[in-house]
Amino acid sequence: MNKRNKVKHLNRNKGHRDALINNMITSLFKYERIESTQAKLKVIRSHAEKLITRAKKNLVADLKPEVQLHNKREVMKRIKDREVVVKLFEDIAKRFESKNGGYTRVLKLVNRASDNSEVGILELTSRKERAILLKERQEKREAQEKAREEKRTARKSDSVPARKK
């Protein structure tokens, strides 16, 4: 009898497997490229393609707000980071608007030396260039630093009581 063969178990129990998949999908959409073993990448690929398709459904102009909210909530079941969800719906889905699948690709690398396991790279097919990604991250960090600095100066001016002479 062939039982327990519908899901790739990845040598983990259900909770650990789900956490692994969610974290790797989040990393894929955040960095647009991840490196891992072939078995994990094949599982992650199918989940990622489904999430991109779900995000693309929100690009339809006459879609009801309830359906848009439902799509976003379904994606947020897998991706817990709100910034990554926003990136998926506003940036990644628009890049793949004209494609009907094949949003990701798995590239094979040389087997890992320590345990000889098959390693590969999973990446989005229409990736932004590395220089553009680094520039965007730097701008984001600078904006966050500026906001923190303004917050600190506001706290200092509020917390220092005026001295009596």
UniProtKB/Swiss-Prot annotation:
Composition skew (Basic and acidic residues), residue ranges: 138-158
Tree of life domain: Bacteria
GO annotation, cellular component aspect: cytosolic large ribosomal subunit
Annotated GO biological process: translation
Gene: rplQ
One Pfam short name: Ribosomal_L17
Name of the protein in its database record: Large ribosomal subunit protein bL17
Keywords noted in UniProt: Ribonucleoprotein, Ribosomal protein
InterPro entries for this protein: Ribosomal_bL17, Ribosomal_bL17_CS, Ribosomal_bL17_sf
UniProt GO MF annotations: structural constituent of ribosome
SUPFAM superfamilies in the record: Prokaryotic ribosomal protein L17
Subunit relationships: Part of the 50S ribosomal subunit. Contacts protein L32.
Protein family per UniProt: Belongs to the bacterial ribosomal protein bL17 family.
PANTHER family the UniProt entry points to: LARGE RIBOSOMAL SUBUNIT PROTEIN BL17M, RIBOSOMAL PROTEIN L17
Disordered: annotated segments: 138-165
